UniProtKB/Swiss-Prot annotation:
Protein name: DNA ligase
NCBIfam families, sorted: dnlj, PRK07956.1
Positions annotated to bind NAD(+): D30, E31, E32, Y33, D34, S79, L80, D108, R131, E165, K304
All copies of domain BRCT, residue ranges: 573-650
Known catalytic reactions: NAD(+) + (deoxyribonucleotide)n-3'-hydroxyl + 5'-phospho-(deoxyribonucleotide)m = (deoxyribonucleotide)n+m + AMP + beta-nicotinamide D-nucleotide
UniProt KW keywords: DNA damage, DNA repair, DNA replication, Ligase, Magnesium, Manganese, Metal-binding, NAD, Zinc
Cross-referenced CDD domains: BRCT_DNA_ligase_like, LIGANc
Cofactor(s) of this protein: Mg(2+); Mn(2+)
Residue spans crossing the bilayer: none
Length: 650
């Protein structure tokens, strides 16, 4: 094989792979593909300097990884607002029509898999990252390169983020499950978990065997000038990506509803697991004008499928004690399959709900599950009772520690701060992804450490030794050292993570970030007036925070010394040239919008969504729309990132 023949072989192999994996229309037999593949591979081994970057031999390579690096998205990967019926869809659309009465929409199936963000630069795939928290994910580029439906190169030289869902078709999922059972491995709970787990394999060779597919559903940062989302997605198809055959452009909500009804009817027979339909405004200019709420874009929603209802046997009801002391009844079920997931537990919410439903141990019950929602019992089949079913009495004492329970309206709470269940669940929260994110310290390991008497409170984690870990079942030298390194690695974490990790009732991630920005390391030293003055803080949140900080003052100080969290850089108002100023942000900037919102608010500025005469500044990036024009008309000072930097340095 000479160089010209090699180039032709690579072109032919990629065309065959595209026809097989993307178009589902094979152009060659497996034997023909394998023969040409090995001829190309032989040429590459003899001429390593001539290896083509798009060669299929380059998809799988590299040693197994020790772990995944973090990767920032150029633009945030947002969650979507959910709508559950036609009435909610109509309300969502009517809000849009008030601003843009002639808006059109694009409807896509919502695939139930693992979201992935592909970054291409100068036509080459340079990074693939998981969604993560929407701003920062994990770099899984080596694994993504093994997925045949992800082009290693595209005919677009400008930088672009292409977003989509990594899925396993139902048929391939069943084969994977059978294979795992033959190998005495635990089966996956559902295709989504299988896709996510496959994408996060440290060994790319394992990922390559999993029959993953990448189906694009959108873009992040991009250079397109077209005014249509639908046309952008058509461009991706021309680059070699899979087309969603059900993608439809709609002109009103009745057309949207017809597409939705069709998808619902095809739900069980569709080759890939679906959990709804995504509806987007097609016009890019309208999308920019509509913008985002704190959590989601205003120009798109997820129209969820109806819950699937199944009949199941309720074997028993157990009582769980959470970190706040709330005792929750949980139904243990005879396992039943719903949408590829084996369900063996369901929530009963509280004891008033049990009384209302008249659910008893041993009942046959009607069970529903919708998307990621925890399975829920909606009614018992009373006519099927044999008389042996047992009603559950409302408990008076904690099932874990035996202390007397307190009734607070519909909730029943254990007040014992030393209750083992409360401590364990507090530790689990402390180490969780939304808190200190201690890798390798999950629920089972915490349970093991707790039962062995090695940890009883947060501080004990920092006193663990390799010797104490090696005495536990399942711990070898490397696993013990990795856990110790992960625990020590939380030193210097963001302050909001530290605050969230404390598990203060009513204080979640969002509130923790506000406290971090407003007060820094003195968050626990504030009075009622200061706390209640924060946006979004009500009386209940303020009282909960103040009481927790009063009771745990010394402990917070000790933990601050141990963990040394980093507070956002704060300038006092007199130091900040933009303190008290009002900002509007528009266009595509070099970092996600949230980065600039946090920067500006930390410097005493206020960020608002719309331009008015009262606006002091408009910060604009590329493709700034009508907000920039309006700001100039109103005489609002318009600055780009470079000019903002000059203002802050002045």
């Amino acid at each position: 094989m000479n160089p010209d023949q090699y180039s032709q072989a690579i072109e032919r192999l990629n065309a065959w792979a595209h026809a097989y994996y993307v178009l589902d229309a094979p152009l060659a037999t497996d034997e023909e593909y394998d023969q040409l593949y090995h001829e190309a591979l032989a040429f590459e081994r003899q001429n390593p300097e001539r290896i083509h970057p798009a060669s299929p031999t380059q998809r799988i390579g590299g040693a197994p990884l020790e772990g995944f690096q973090k990767a920032s998205h150029l633009e945030r990967m947002w969650s979507l607002e959910d709508v559950f019926d036609f009435g909610e869809l109509k309300s969502w659309a009517e809000r849009l029509y008030k601003q843009f009465p002639h808006a059109t929409f694009v409807c896509d199936p919502k695939f139930d898999g693992a979201s992935l963000n592909l970054l291409y630069e100068e036509g080459r795939l340079v990074r693939a990252a998981t969604r993560g928290d929407g701003l920062i994910g994990e770099d899984v580029t080596q694994n993504a390169r093994t997925i045949p439906s992800i082009p290693l190169s595209i005919p677009l030289l400008e930088r672009i983020e292409i977003r989509g869902e990594v899925v396993i078709p139902k048929e391939d999922f069943e084969k994977l499950q059978e294979e795992r059972l033959r190998e005495n491995e635990s089966p996956f709970a559902n295709p989504r978990n299988a896709a996510a787990g496959s994408l996060r394999q440290l060994d790319p060779a394992i990922t390559a065997k999993r029959k993953l597919r990448f189906i694009p559903w959108g873009v992040g940062a991009h250079p397109f000038k077209t005014g249509s989302f639908f046309e952008i997605m058509k461009s991706l198809e021309s680059y070699g990506f899979i087309r969603s055959p059900e993608r439809t452009r709609c002109h009103n909500i009745h057309e949207i509803e017809r597409v939705y009804a069709l998808l619902v009817s095809e739900r069980s027979t569709h080759p890939v697991m679906l959990d709804g339909m995504v509806v987007r405004v097609d016009e890019i200019a309208y999308q920019r004008e509509l913008g985002y709420t704190i959590k989601a874009p205003r120009f798109a929603c997820a129209y969820k499928f109806p819950a699937i209802e199944k009949k199941a046997r309720l074997l028993s009801i157990t009582l769980q004690v959470g970190r706040s002391g709330v005792v929750t009844p949980v139904a243990n079920l005879e396992p039943v399959e719903i949408e590829g997931a084996m369900i063996s537990r369901a929530t009963l919410h509280n004891f008033d709900e049990i009384k209302r439903l008249d659910v008893r141990e041993g009942d046959w019950v009607s069970l529903i599950r919708s998307g990621d929602v925890i399975p829920k019992i909606i009614q018992p089949f009373a006519h099927l009772r044999s008389g042996e079913e047992k009603p559950l009495s409302r408990p008076t004492h904690c099932p874990e520690c035996g202390s007397e329970l307190l009734v607070e309206e519909v909730l029943i709470k254990c007040q014992n701060l030393s209750c083992p269940a409360r401590i364990k669940n507090s530790l689990i929260h402390f180490a969780s992804k939304k808190a200190l994110n201690i890798d390798g310290l999950g629920e089972k390991i915490i349970e093991q450490l707790f039962e062995a008497g090695l940890i009883k409170e947060f501080e004990d984690l920092f006193s663990l030794t390799k010797e104490s870990l090696l005495s536990l079942e399942g711990f070898k030298e490397k696993k013990a050292q990795n856990l110790l390194d992960a625990i020590q690695g939380v030193r210097g974490c963001d302050l909001w993570r530290f605050i969230n990790a404390l598990g203060i009732e009513h204080i979640g991630e969002g509130a923790a970030k506000k406290l971090s920005h407003a007060f820094g390391l003195a968050f626990h030293l504030q009075n009622h007036e200061a706390i209640i003055g924060l946006e979004g803080f009500g009386e209940e949140m303020a009282q909960s925070l103040l009481e927790f900080c009063r009771v745990n003052h010394e402990r917070i100080e000790h933990l601050l010394g141990l963990i040394e969290p980093l507070a956002p850089i704060q300038l006092t108002p007199q130091d900040s040239p933009i303190a008290g100023k009002s900002f509007v942000i528009t266009g595509t900037l070099s970092a996600p919008r949230e980065h600039f919102v946090e920067l500006l608010t930390s410097l005493g500025a206020k960020v608002v969504s719309s331009v008015s005469k009262k606006s002091d500044f408009l910060l604009y990036g590329e493709s700034a729309g009508s907000k920039l024009e309006k700001a100039r008309e109103l005489g609002v000072r318009c600055v780009n990132e470079e000019e903002l930097g000059e203002i802050l340095e002045s």
